[in-house]
Amino acid sequence: MAATTANPEMTSDVPPLGPAIASGNPGPGIQGGGAIVQRAIKRRPGLDFDDDGEGNSKFLRCDDDQMSNDKERFARSDDEQSSADKERLARENHSEIERRRRNKMTAYITELSDMVPTCSALARKPDKLTILRMAVSHMKSLRGTGNTSTDGTYKPSFLTDQELKHLILEAADGFLFIVSCETGRVVYVSDSVTPVLNQPQSEWFGSTLYDQVHPDDVDKLREQLSTSENALTGRILDLKTGTVKKEGQQSSMRMCMGSRRSFICRMRCGNSSVDSVSMNRLSFVRNRCRNGLGSAKDGEPHFVVVHCTGYIKAWPPAGVSLPDDDPEAGQGSKFCLVAIGRLQVTSSPNCTDMSNVCQPTEFISRHNIEGIFTFVDHRCVATVGYQPQELLGKNIVEFCHPEDQQLLRDSFQQVVKLKGQVLSVMFRFRSKNREWLWVRTSSFTFQNPYSDEIEYIICTNTNVKNSSQEPRPSLSNTIQRPQLGPTANLSLEMGSGQLAPRQQQQQTELDVVPGRDGLTSCNHSQVSVQPVTTTGPEHSKPLEKSESLFAQDRDPRFSEIYSNISTDQSKGISSSTVPATQQLFSQGNTFPPTPRPAENFRNSGLAPPVTIVQPSTSAGQMLAQISRHSNPTQGAAPAWTPSTRPGFSAQQVVTEATAKTRSSQFGVGSFQTPSSFSPMSLPGASTASPGAAAYPSLTNRGSNFAPETGQTAGQFQTRTAEGVGVWPQWQGQQSHHRSSSNEQHVQQPSAQQPGQPEVFQEMLSMLGDQSNSYNNEEFPDLTMFPSFSE
């Protein structure tokens, strides 16, 4: 204050700095010198010598404020730097964490891709979403809930658990069993183990699966039941990378719960009785064929090969508690194998006694309307021995027995008329080894649905049994036919008017049969004897044809026939008793006694006529076809040997004009009886003369059948036979035969049409006397014909 008073200029010129600085509002006078003041503050020249406490205190107070601001500024910059470092470090840590997370997820996805079979099978690695989707599908397939509800309790509403189980086991043809993986104890086995392994359920309950398998398969079974890591895991080759690594992941996957098990082992087969009704046919066949490992020795168990397929499951299942007395209850959650066992039939040989179980061997064939094979099943090799190409293009009649050919033809014609209906016929089929097999053929036609035309005939041919085992003899064995070579059997389809000369010769040889009873049907003009020609010039033509056909130089057998002809056969008849325009033949040899018993023939030749009831259609047609063998074309003379030449006591001579007016079945100058002759007259005609034995029985029919016009000149003349052998029962009838020899015999017209062949008299004779009742014991060789009893 003293200084201020002493220096007034300074006091007025220089305002005090303290209030100005303190107030912060400088006056107008010092506005222009703000910079100076600032420089003065920087230099602080006047402050050094100012000892005033107030002023000094003011200057010191200003310096402290500036230093504190610098400290704050420096502290703030340090904080900002530290926060930036923290943020940078935080960002780096987050990136590292994300990178690690992505790496882990990639590793897990890769591992999942290796575990899912559908992913590992792809050529290129799929994306993550595809891997996850395939993994879900694979898990659903393992659980078996792909098309069911999420709780896994779905089952068909119309089936109970037992019905569903039986259907599954029947379809699989095996048995279901559940085995504990730790101990091998059998938890459950189905009742179908009995037909498969021949063992009851009681033998499996309470035992272990190790007791049921072969001792050599125990280690394999223990490996399949194991759910832990195997210490001796091998090494596997990764085909993708080409590297060899340990079996780690695959082993873990194989041992995880729900993994599949499929193995083959040998199981013990029991000896309990098998009820064939309670199981299907396939199980019964397998039961008979289960000796695939060879026959077991006495006292040793018998084993069969069983294929087991199943899954490893948790036992007990979730939500199921075992009873306290169960030995598995105190061991916690365990695993079990649920599998189905089936017999491995491929290791079993073919059964040799399958004929008692299986159906007869059969094959399917297709034919056209004519019966020619157009398709043959491959099973024909096992049935008849032929390859399919050996049958294609050939007619089925060619492989049929000659006696059954017409029956087969009729069946084919009938099945065409039935149009879709099944027709069955049984005949003898010639196999490749030349044996006759009884074959039953069920045939039906296939029609085009648009044109309604028959496309083809489908036949199911079943081999019944071999005909060699049949006790039924053929006709060739009963009539003692001589062996004439393989060409003796002719086709039954050809008629008598269609035979070629060579076939006529074979036909004539076929008719050389001893012991024929129905000689009234024989063509007497065709007997190869020395001809006696009368004044009729026209009658020498058929004789010349006969001599040229059966000349001695044509066949060596004819020379023997001609040499054995007795001289009395050429003996002529005086023209006083016979018209001049007729040719005569005579023969004196007797017919040898037939091997048939005499009591089978009755004195029925003179009985009242009986109308024949024609047999059934098939039998009648067969007889009609066989009868064609006995009626060759006119002019062909059969060769009769002395031992087989029949004896006739009368000669029937018919004029040429009369023969021309007759129907085709009445040969020129022949003793041919129509097909409507009663078989009752046949036994008598076998030994007595035809004019004396058979024709008297026809005189009573004169009212019904008038003689044909033009036959007045052709009356039947009779002459006593020389050396004729007569059956004893007919000796008493000779007088009546001779008394009726001069009667005019009227030929009975045939009941059939002219184009229809006459019945083979041998067959009619075997039918026997209709006035008596015959049974099959008297005719054991004719099982194909029904017994005729009236």
UniProtKB/Swiss-Prot annotation:
Residues 167-171 are annotated as: Mediates the transcription activity and dimerization of the AHR:ARNT complex. SMART domains: HLH (SM00353), PAC (SM00086), PAS (SM00091). It is found in: Nucleus. The modification N-acetylalanine is found at A2. Residues 89-142 form the bHLH domain. This is Aryl hydrocarbon receptor nuclear translocator. Residues 683-697 have a biased composition (Low complexity).
